[in-house]
Amino acid sequence: MGHHTFDPEKADRLEDAARRYRYLSMEELVGALKPSNDAVVADLGSGTGFYADDVARFVGKVYAVDVQDEMHAHYREKGVPENVELVTAEISDTPFETDALDAAYTTMTYHEFASEDALDEVRRVLKQDARFVVADWSSRGSGEVGPTTDERYSKDDAVSALEDAGFDVERADERTETFVLLARTQ
């Protein structure tokens, strides 16, 4: 299950607003994060920075974390906002200090890094009572868009994994092709 990375040759598809917002709008993401204007937030699996651009308008700093330098190259070509810093790292091994982040989110990339080590790392770098938003492709979806269903997680498996890592899952919504979770650190 999971742990593939998105093909950088198809990176332009990640900038299709109609397609991306169909599954998670900027308003829903920012509303779930509820950031202060000086918040420090991480976009985990940021790709070309589609959602980082949105969130950057509402916070002090966004760390756009991606394992692929090629994705950061696409983001640089597009133009990186002044308050966004590109970080090349595995989610299981980020360069952040303990309790460094006010919030984190992952949009359609949870299946690429989901593991006990990665979730423990996310928990480590988030402050007490910080929000973690997970929007990803559901194994209950058709697989006609996004990764194949065998690369996806179910909402229930994702909830269990977050709870096992010390998160309190406050909301878990199942949708046609995706699920969205809102969790907090305990």
Which role does the model predict for each range below?
Residues 10-30:
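Conserved SAM-binding loop and adjacent beta-strand
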Residues 102-116:
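A short SAM/SAH-binding and catalytic strip from SAM-dependent methyltransferases
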Residues 42, 47-94:
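Class I SAM-dependent methyltransferase SAM/SAH-binding core
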Residues 13-17, 131-182:
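C-terminal alpha-helical "lid/dimerization" subdomain adjacent to the S-adenosyl-L-methionine
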Residues 92-103:
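A short acidic, Gly/Pro-enriched loop at the edge of an enzyme's catalytic core
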Residues 117-131:
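A short glycine-rich, Lys/Arg-flanked "PGG" loop and its adjoining helix->strand segment in the class I
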Residues 1-12:
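N-terminal, positively charged/glycine-rich alpha-helical extensions of SAM-dependent methyltransferases
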Residues 30-36, 94-95:
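Glycine-rich helix-loop-beta junction characteristic of Rossmann-like nucleotide cofactor-binding loops
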